[in-house]
Each structure stands twice: as structure tokens, then as C-alpha cells.
């Protein structure tokens, strides 16, 4: 098993919507697929780069997947352990939400949020939550991904908040960022009604 690769970034290209890195490790070029969002964090060509890797062995080919953080690689492995979640869908999930947001959605059983990822239907989202909820609740403590105690409105309120903000034109990432920020700033408490969360979220997003 290849745990990580460290070398110089020889090139980056996109193929069929996939982000592929060419990593030069002591004269050997490794092609590594990585989450698309990693593009903004990559160094310039020729600069040093370390990626934590997952090797998938098929009958016809070996595929390397690379991640800039070990926690991201470990979460990817958890995702693809679920029936119906292949590597490409695992990467799509990692691209749709931040690490902490994705783990929180699974632990909280927020299947509505999970199913917004292209390719993830309601049944797949339910399977993710069912199979990984307890595992990730424990794992995120070790990985340091614990949310704050007031990181989101209670489940009964969250759907109303999200639907209202989506209708106003905000996207999923903006909504999650706003809800997390106003909770961390103690502008709203978990048990307050949807109207309070919506008002503060709009104010935060308008800054």
C-alpha cells in the first residue's frame, strides 16, 4: 500500500471532469486523481507537493487517488466502503461540502443535504447515514473535526431555514457557511425558531 507520495508537481490536467495530477517522484511520474476543489490549493509546477494516497486495484488497471490532507483520504476510504459509493461518487461528495460539513451531514442524518451531490439519490444518502453515522461520530473526534455545540439549528428547523435561503438565491455552501458562522458568533442559539436563523443568516450573507 502506498501511504503517500512526495515529489514535484509536473503537471495538472482535466479529463472528463476529473482533475489529474502528474507527480514526479525521483524521476517516476505518478498520475493521481484528486478532488476538483484541490486545484486552488496546489503549488506552482515544479514545486514540492505531498499527497496522501489511496490505491484502487482493478483487473485492467491500477488507479491512484490523492488528497492534500490525511483526514480527507481517510474519509474517502470510509465513503467508498459503503455499497453503491464508488471512487468517483466519493470524490463528488468531498467536492460538494467541506470535510467537517460532510461528516456533520452524515452523523446528523441530513440526507436532504447529502442527496444534493450529483449522483447521490435519497436511498444512497440514507445508506451513507445508516452505515457511517456511528463510525464517523467516533472518527471525527480523532481527526479533530468536531463541530461546535451550536453549529446548526435543530433538525426540525434546519429544513425550513435551508429552503427559504435557497429560494432567495443562496447556494448550499453559502447557507452552510452562514449558519455555522452565526452559531459560532452566538448570534442565534440552537433552539430558536427558523425566522431568527433566517434573519441572521441573511444579515451575515449581506456583509
From Swiss-Prot:
GO molecular function: ATP binding; four-way junction DNA binding; four-way junction helicase activity
Residues covered by region (Domain I): 1-68
Location of this chain's protein in the cell: Cytoplasm
Subunit structure, as described in the record: Homotetramer. Forms an RuvA(8)-RuvB(12)-Holliday junction (HJ) complex. HJ DNA is sandwiched between 2 RuvA tetramers; dsDNA enters through RuvA and exits via RuvB. An RuvB hexamer assembles on each DNA strand where it exits the tetramer. Each RuvB hexamer is contacted by two RuvA subunits (via domain III) on 2 adjacent RuvB subunits; this complex drives branch migration. In the full resolvosome a probable DNA-RuvA(4)-RuvB(12)-RuvC(2) complex forms which resolves the HJ.
Family that this chain belongs to: Belongs to the RuvA family.
Function as written in the Swiss-Prot or TrEMBL entry: The RuvA-RuvB-RuvC complex processes Holliday junction (HJ) DNA during genetic recombination and DNA repair, while the RuvA-RuvB complex plays an important role in the rescue of blocked DNA replication forks via replication fork reversal (RFR). RuvA specifically binds to HJ cruciform DNA, conferring on it an open structure. The RuvB hexamer acts as an ATP-dependent pump, pulling dsDNA into and through the RuvAB complex. HJ branch migration allows RuvC to scan DNA until it finds its consensus sequence, where it cleaves and resolves the cruciform DNA.
Protein name according to UniProt: Holliday junction branch migration complex subunit RuvA
Organism: Synechococcus elongatus (strain ATCC 33912 / PCC 7942 / FACHB-805)
Lineage of source species: Bacteria, Bacillati, Cyanobacteriota, Cyanophyceae, Synechococcales
